[in-house]
């Protein structure tokens, strides 16, 4: 299984990197730092649909889906998160039924000023759920703002379970990876913290960053408090 890669900066660089990947998929080249964000129509598309809450060992990440723009991708993520879609354990080749995929997995690849990547049931970057599905690109939805939740892939039509969250605009990824959610500002701060942990030569955290629990919140419903947080009591009315 190929490592999920998504580093393309220009047509010339992409051709060079594709050749390099064919020889060694373990050490992709980091992209150049992106330019300052530009005001585009993409920023006008608002998230719609359910919200995903990812409780990690380093804090909570909350993102609302783009259900209208990426319905198949959102449905796949929700089904894997809730255990309503069968998947194959890449380590045992065993078919998993009624078992959430994401709970207990790790962020296996983190790069400052770029993104954090997770969703691999093998925890290595080479695993997948035993199936793939097609991309869903919206011409007005791009990587022009931080906090994009998107699918990792190894080429067109190779989406599975792996995803990444950006911490900066990364427009060289436009129309190469399906964007299916937008994370809020506090979550982007968590992403930045995770991206700056100590890493090995393959950008894997030395100390595991665990995705403890993934919860799907229906649209319009409140997000429950983070584990360990206490509910805030409303202030007493003034006389």
Q: What is each model feature region?
A:
Residues 11-13:
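Repetitive helical segments and hydrophobic/amphipathic motifs
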């Amino acid at each position: 299984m190929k490592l999920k890669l998504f580093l393309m900066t220009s047509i010339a660089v992409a051709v060079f990197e594709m050749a390099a990947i064919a020889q060694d998929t373990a050490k992709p080249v980091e992209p150049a730092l992106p330019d300052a964000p530009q005001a585009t129509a993409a920023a006008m598309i608002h998230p719609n649909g359910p919200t995903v809450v990812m409780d990690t060992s380093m804090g909570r990440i909350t993102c609302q889906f783009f259900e209208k723009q990426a319905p198949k991708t959102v449905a796949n993520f929700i089904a894997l998160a809730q255990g309503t879609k069968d998947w194959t354990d890449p380590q045992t080749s065993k078919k998993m039924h009624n078992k959430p995929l994401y709970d207990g997995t790790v962020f296996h690849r983190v790069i400052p000023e770029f993104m954090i990547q997770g969703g691999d049931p093998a925890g290595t970057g080479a695993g997948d759920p035993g199936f793939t599905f097609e991309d869903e690109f919206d011409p007005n939805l791009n990587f022009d703002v931080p906090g994009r939740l998107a699918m990792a892939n190894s080429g067109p039509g190779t989406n599975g379970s792996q995803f990444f969250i950006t911490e900066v605009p990364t427009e060289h990824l436009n129309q190469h990876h399906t964007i299916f959610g937008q994370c809020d500002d506090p979550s982007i701060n968590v992403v930045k913290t995770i991206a700056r942990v100590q890493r090995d030569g393959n950008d894997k955290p030395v100390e595991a960053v665990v995705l403890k629990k993934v919860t799907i919140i229906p649209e319009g419903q409140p997000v429950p408090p983070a584990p360990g947080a206490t509910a805030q009591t409303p202030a007493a009315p003034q006389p």
